[in-house]
Amino acid sequence: MRIFLVSVILINACWAGPIVETNYGKVEGIEYEGAEVFLAIPFAKPPVDDLRFEKPVAPDPWEDVYPATQYRNDCTPHYRLVAQFSSYSGEDCLTLNIIKPKKAEKLPVLFWIHGGGYEIGSASQHGYEFFAKRYASQGVIVATVQYRLGFMGFFSEGTSDVQGNWGLFDQAAALEFVKSNIENFGGDPNQITIWGYSAGAASVSQLTMSPYTRDSYSKAIIMSASSFVGWATGPNVVETSKQLAEILGCPWPGAKECMKKKSLHEIFDAIEVQGWTTGTIDILRWSPVIDGDFMTKNPEELIKESPVKPTLIGMSNKEGSYFAALNMGRVIADFGLSPEDMPKVDEEFISEIIGRKLLYNNRYGENREKVWNDILDFYVKQGKPAEVKDLNGFYVDRYSELLSDITFNVPILREITSRVERKTPVWTYRMDHYDKNIWKKHIPEQARGSPHANEYHYLFDMPVMAKIDMKKEPDSWIQNDLIDMVISFAKTGVPQIEDVEWRPVSDPDDVNFLNIRSDGVSIEHGLFQEPLAFWNELRQREGFDLIDPTNSAMHSSNKDEL
């Protein structure tokens, strides 16, 4: 009997996964492809019941070894249909995942924040397998985090008691957990690179500025988004919160206690009544706000107080085509073109969109018609060729570019120039390459390019738009270059691409950038300078900023002083 028990103990010991001590207790992970993986480690108490719509609270210590061997809940999205696609969706979701090499000591850390418009997405959708094979194998540790989304993450009354930004506070708590515990996993707490894409990138931008987090990282990677945009500063979030509370029969102000008692089913029913998108250029119903706490000022002002640290900023050459021509992201943005709508896009179509979705609520007041004509002239009339074989393709492309500039290109360029003016070392790239399989046959050739989310195929092996064969060229070397770029930056603070002398941006008025094309890479200049100049001049002239309405007051006062 004694021999049998000893045998059982020895067998169990042989099958036990890697165990690491944290500040709250031990966690047991799994091994995969030469890496050690720890899944769904809690970094905060479940934000349920009395903790709903509150800042995250540190978890209670645990005595037994915590089984960090499988994913648990994704955070509740903003819309019931999205939640139904996830087998594991719920409020108890504040966990993070760590993927590390087996042998690790003082390794750099990539702290990944997923995108999804602050309303959908999860850490689990990225998996751990590719991170283990392509990142941990090259001597970096990856931490992927979850944060509250949609109404659970960003409900706000615009008061100190119900300020919103719960999702950003979750990210801050996760970052603090990693910084305090990563040394036990073989990581260097002084070499944490915060990294995100889309809303995850806007989050990274916000973390670099917030007094809660700006001293907790060493480098930042911001891909295809910026906090310098209205959809990341929530001009309508308080009004959206008020509408939701009223539909649910909760008092306003003072809705928090009533809202805490509402079930997810009741809230989803109310969202169905309210609608899950704004239908305007502000795009998101739920997003961060300028709360005077996490975000004490508008990002364009707050960045002046942020520390100077190496920053890598990237984008695609046709960001808006993801939402327009490809008709994707419909659960968060309402700008898509169906195959039936595509042939109808012309100057009149674009003009109607400008009036209804950009200049709604009489934006620009008595100058609204002039601004309307200025935008139409810049995006359609000035560039319209005298003779063109595919006029519809021209209009579809211009429609996509209008969305690209307002929601991505111009705010990203503004952030780049603001950081460079502060002497921050900023490396910039633009992704022009795309695999032809991501584009459907009905989409005009002129409107095609590298859309938003294109890098997901290469950085994470995630087939967002189509399955791409990464064994063929040029996709194989582009994938290698992008991953090497991220890893070298995390290790040294300088992104490195073989055979390319890539320097930080030196002139904010003529941004130099790495262009990643199908036929190679090269250093070029003048990144989206014309639309940047157009929107900056319009803001200065009118005292209102369509790119980020929360930033208008500052420029209105500047206008008055001139």
From Swiss-Prot:
Cleavable signal peptide: 1-16
Keywords: Disulfide bond, Endoplasmic reticulum, Glycoprotein, Hydrolase, Serine esterase, Signal
Pfam families attached to this UniProt entry: COesterase
Name of the protein this chain belongs to: Gut esterase 1
PANTHER family documented for this protein: CARBOXYLESTERASE
Highest taxon in the source lineage: Eukaryota
Glycosylation sites: N73
Residue ranges annotated as motif Prevents secretion from ER: 559-562
EC number: 3.1.1.1
Gene Ontology BP terms: cellular catabolic process
Gene Ontology cellular-component terms listed: endoplasmic reticulum lumen; peroxisome
Entry comment describing in which tissues the protein is expressed: Expressed only in the intestine.
Name of the gene: ges-1
InterPro entries referenced in this protein's UniProt entry, alphabetically: AB_hydrolase_fold, CarbesteraseB, Carboxylesterase_B_AS, Carboxylesterase_B_CS, Type-B_Carboxylest/Lipase
Organism classification: Eukaryota, Metazoa, Ecdysozoa, Nematoda, Chromadorea
